[in-house]
Amino acid sequence: SGGLDSTLALLVCVKTFDKLGFSRKGIIGITMPGFGTTDRTYNNALHLMSSLGITTKEISIKEACIQHFKDIDHDMTNHNVTYENGQARERTQILMDYAILKIR
């Protein structure tokens, strides 16, 4: 997301790959823009991934979240916990599924 937790996790991965002598291209940084993603955070994430020399991938979560909110009859103008958590859960689902896909 470009936030502090994501940034620190990425830096730990990079340091670990460097210590083990692995290519940083083996790290896949995924940016998942959603409804709250600002240009600043989006560009910060892209710049960080590029400057570290890792592989980058972008997967928008917007359409998946729209479908989810429709499925549960949630009004998207209501930016409550359901709205926020729906986006967080979609990101988690993508990361878990992508990781499993890549290790098989």
Question: For the regions a protein language model found, what residue spans apply to each?
Answer:
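Long hydrophobic segments that form regular secondary structure
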Residues: 83-87, 91-104
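Short, well-ordered alpha-helical packing segments
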Residues: 11-14, 45-49, 96
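A conserved beta-strand->alpha-helix junction
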Residues: 22, 26-80, 88
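Conserved helix-loop functional segments at active or binding sites
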Residues: 15-22, 67, 74, 97, ...
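Short glycine/serine/threonine-rich phosphate/pyrophosphate-binding segments
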Residues: 6-9, 38-40, 92
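A phosphate-binding catalytic loop at a beta-strand-loop-alpha-helix junction
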Residues: 1-21
